[in-house]
């Protein structure tokens, strides 16, 4: 099969008008992506694409497992503590970044982008999903997604102490706050340069929210909030 520069399936019988953007369309009654040149596009991608490592390995409390750790690759970060069931500050080492430097030496941003793009294409991967280095993917000319956070204007705060939410990685936002839409749009506009790239497939707003072990807990917590809370006003 022949593919265009965006990774779209270069078949003129399936081509639509070029829009300069990734869009959605139906072919044979089924939804599909179209790339900026109008060709059908199947996203065969992975999350967390980057050239500086896929994450850090915790050192705090595990020092005895390692030797000769180069402090240049050690940093303080927030990692998930399995025993405590929540995120906590810890020292961590980035072995991926260290190994990359050992094998390839110091490289410019452009060289890292070229390396990453060539590696992905060699593996048959044509797109970069959430948590990727968006600027690197754009430079590498790999279709990518942009990740932005919604506005955190206010959080659910139930009056009933028995309705305690399991907020293991983030608090639960009040999406009906009057400033929520305005502030979220401001957050999106902060990445407008990336979003306007022809290689941008689309935008994720927020990751998933903390799952609750008990069904309906979010709803009950919402109804237990003070009367002035925007969501309580909406659903009461």
Label each region the model flagged.
Residues 1-138, 153-194, 198-202:
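Active-site-adjacent substrate/metal-binding segments within catalytic domains
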Residues 50, 213, 218-219:
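Single-residue recognition of alpha-helix boundary sites
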Residues 207-211:
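Short, internal active-site loops enriched in acidic
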Residues 220-236:
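Active-site neighborhood of glycoside hydrolase catalytic domains
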């Amino acid at each position: 099969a022949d593919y265009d520069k965006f990774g779209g399936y270069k078949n003129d019988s399936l081509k639509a008008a070029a829009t300069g953007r990734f869009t959605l369309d139906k072919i044979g009654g089924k939804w599909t992506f179209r790339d900026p040149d109008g060709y059908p596009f199947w996203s065969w991608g992975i999350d967390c694409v980057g050239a500086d490592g896929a994450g850090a390995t915790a050192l705090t409390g595990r020092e005895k497992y390692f030797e000769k750790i180069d402090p240049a690759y050690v940093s303080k970060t927030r990692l998930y503590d399995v025993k405590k069931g929540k995120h906590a500050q810890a020292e961590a080492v980035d072995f991926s970044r260290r190994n990359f430097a050992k094998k390839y030496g110091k490289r410019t941003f452009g060289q890292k982008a070229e390396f990453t793009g060539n590696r992905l294409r060699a593996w048959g991967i044509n797109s970069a999903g959430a948590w990727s280095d968006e600027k690197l993917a754009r430079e590498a000319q790999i279709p990518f997604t942009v990740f932005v956070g919604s506005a955190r204007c206010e959080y659910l705060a139930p009056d009933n102490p028995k309705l305690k939410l399991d907020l293991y990685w983030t608090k639960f936002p009040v999406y009906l706050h009057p400033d929520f839409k305005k502030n979220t749009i401001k957050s999106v506009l902060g990445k407008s340069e990336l979003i306007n790239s022809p290689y941008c497939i689309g935008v994720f707003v927020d990751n998933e929210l903390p799952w609750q072990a008990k069904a309906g807990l979010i709803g009950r917590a919402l109804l237990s909030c003070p009367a002035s809370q925007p969501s309580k006003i909406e659903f009461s």
